[in-house]
Regions:
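Glycosyltransferase catalytic domains, chiefly GT-A lineage
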Residues: 1-237
Length: 237
């Protein structure tokens, strides 16, 4: 079984940040392969979109694309870890316990962290409506799944999930930005989380539908007590 670690940098500063983050994890997994994707690795459509919408280099529309590209180049049942460049290790040399567990547990396809921040506050009404949910849905009362880092086991289920995530972002770009929602937002709405909002509701709706894909759900307390932490580094200046 192979293990690959990937990230993305939109410019020289973010590429350097991502390379350091990826290398720090590779130091724990000496036989792992790594790749930091750059704009040159993206199709023209995504790069052109990013020129018009610089936030998140096109509102993070590239994220499922690069994960899919990386998964397609590894073998069935190999493991891939995606992490944002600002993620980092709490302590050098200490294991990432949830990741080690996921690697050993063949029954799970995707490992994802569910935060304490409620979906209702961080997903706009248009995305909620696109998932055929209303503002009273129980799914909005639970924590949003983070797109900051997650692990993938290559198989048809994880690839189908990626294809669906990417297709939604490409086909519904206008509702995955920061424009005012055409549908009513929840009264506790604070701000949209774009690719993450879609990622989160995809996971939740598939769990409710008892879809064949299996998620290893990582809760905030467990994540924040582990060694791989989100937003550990500042944005480059």
């Amino acid at each position: 079984m192979k293990f690959k670690i990937i990230s993305f940098g939109s410019n020289e500063e973010y590429i350097t940040l991502a390379e350091k983050s990826v290398q720090s994890v590779k130091n724990l997994y000496s036989k792992s392969e790594t790749k930091v994707f750059k704009p040159d690795d993206l199709p023209d459509d995504i790069n052109n979109y990013a020129k018009s919408y610089s936030k998140g280099y096109g509102y993070w529309i590239w994220k499922p694309y690069i994960i899919k590209e990386a998964l397609c180049k590894i073998n069935e049942n190999d493991i891939l870890l995606y992490l944002d460049g600002r993620s980092g290790l709490r302590k050098t040399g200490k294991p990432i316990r949830w990741l080690d567990s996921f690697i050993l547990e063949n029954k799970f396809d995707i490992a994802s962290w569910q935060m304490i921040h409620k979906e209702m506050s961080w997903t706009n009404g248009d995305i909620i409506s696109a998932f055929n949910l209303d503002l009273n849905s129980e799914l909005l009362k639970t924590g949003q799944f983070a797109a900051t880092f997650h692990a993938w086991r290559k198989n048809i289920r994880s690839l189908n999930f990626l294809n669906e995530w990417l297709k939604f972002l490409l086909d519904n770009r206008e509702i995955c930005r920061d424009e005012v929602s055409q549908n009513l937002n929840h009264k506790k709405f604070i701000g949209n989380r774009h690719d993450q909002s879609v990622f989160s509701l995809m996971i939740k709706t598939k769990i409710v539908k008892n879809d064949s894909i299996a998620f290893k759900i990582l809760h905030s307390k467990k994540i924040l007590n582990d060694n791989l932490l989100p937003h550990l580094k500042d944005h480059p200046k």
